[in-house]
Amino acid sequence: MVNHTATHLLHQSLKDVLGSHVNQAGSLVHPEYLRFDITHPNKISSTELDDIELIVNQKIGENITVDTSIKSLEEAKKEGATALFGEKYGDNVRVVTIGEFSKELCGGTHVSSTGKISKFKIKHDKAISSGIRRIHAITSNHVDLYLKEKSDELGLLKEAEKKKEVEKQSQSILLNSVDIDSIIEYPIMDFDGIELLFSKVELGDASDLK
């Protein structure tokens, strides 16, 4: 129910940000995520995705009542209800209305108000065919789990970078600890036409070789 209502909010937000040409081209409502396919010719920029996500979360924060009603198809269309392109409807249809924000023909189950969705996060979008893009999103506690996972990954990355920097600094200290004056050069020696130069480097401690 949560992800179904979130899909309606996403649909209208996509139209608001990308344009009225956006239409649903497919969807999947799963308990842990939602997937929404739309008609759109271009890649959706990160700024546009942020704007879309912001609108959805604003509507969630407004805790708008989700109303369902049965109306004639003609009446629903006059009220501006969004219908799926190519879908066949009977004389009477079920209309899901989310305040003044969204009105769609839909037979699915929904939450009673948008606040029950709690949170909304777009994970990514991609092109699945010419002119069709697919958006993956999550809601509620799945957003918290996703953000924690990303935070943990970032922490591991920072730790790895920190380790690299420490190793780099250690190597620099080791090189700087070698006294140039302590390098004793030996004469160049010839081995079967190959000239080799030997030298001896004196280090302060055996641990410097580790």
Predicted regions and their residues:
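Active/ligand-binding-proximal structured segments within catalytic/core domains
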Residues: 1-38
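Ordered, soluble secondary-structure elements with a strong preference for glycine-centered loop motifs
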Residues: 1-5, 42-50, 147-148, 203-210
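Short intrinsically disordered coil segments
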Residues: 5, 54, 109-110, 150-155
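Generic, well-ordered alpha-helical scaffold segments in large soluble proteins
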Residues: 9-17, 51-62, 138, 142, ...
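Terminal appendage regions of diverse proteins
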Residues: 21, 117-210
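Gly/Ser/Thr-rich helix-start
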Residues: 27, 108-109, 132
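Short glycine-rich or small-residue beta-strand-to-loop segments that form or flank ligand, phosphate
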Residues: 37-39, 197-198
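Non-catalytic interaction/regulatory segments
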Residues: 38-128, 137
